[in-house]
Amino acid sequence: MARRQRKAIKSEINIVPFLDVLLVLVLIFMATAPIISQSVQVELPDSVQSQEVSNEDKVPVILEVAGIGKYAISIGGERQEGLTEEMVTQLSRQEFDKDNNTLFLVGGAKEVPYEEVIKALNLLHLAGIKSVGLMTNPI
């Protein structure tokens, strides 16, 4: 009787399936990374230094966010309160059309959610304004 020889067991790792698994993991991380970064909550630090803004002695247009959906705007020293989002966009566009070098500042109360300040910035962006300053109080 002839003895059959068995194939020797390979003790080395098979690279192809290993690379397949690694590539799938990389794809999963690439797909989930943008989702994770969009859901990060931010705690902003207090302002230790603030810089004064001057615009050739022009009075800036100040958009104040007093609460959720509560906006007030100061144009040339005249304050208008209780504005809707459409009114804010319209008034901002009118001031920007008069002089495209007008300085726009956005200020929010401490208790206003960060999302509302972003909405105010988006309203100014819809009005065609590309440069906006944020108001802070020095500590």
From Swiss-Prot:
Keyword DNA-binding found: no
One Gene Ontology molecular-function label: transmembrane transporter activity
Entry's Gene Ontology BP terms: cell division; protein transport
GO cellular component term, pick one: plasma membrane
Keywords assigned: Cell cycle, Cell division, Cell inner membrane, Cell membrane, Membrane, Transmembrane, Transmembrane helix
Family: Belongs to the ExbD/TolR family.
Protein name: Tol-Pal system protein TolR
PANTHER family recorded: EXBD MEMBRANE COMPONENT OF PMF-DRIVEN MACROMOLECULE IMPORT SYSTEM (PTHR30558), TOL-PAL SYSTEM PROTEIN TOLR (PTHR30558:SF7)
Membrane topology: Single-pass membrane protein
Function: Part of the Tol-Pal system, which plays a role in outer membrane invagination during cell division and is important for maintaining outer membrane integrity.
Transmembrane segments: 15-35
Keyword Ligase among UniProt keywords: no
Subunit organization: The Tol-Pal system is composed of five core proteins: the inner membrane proteins TolA, TolQ and TolR, the periplasmic protein TolB and the outer membrane protein Pal. They form a network linking the inner and outer membranes and the peptidoglycan layer.
Major location (coarse): membrane
Location(s), subcellular: Cell inner membrane
Gene3D superfamilies: 3.30.420.270
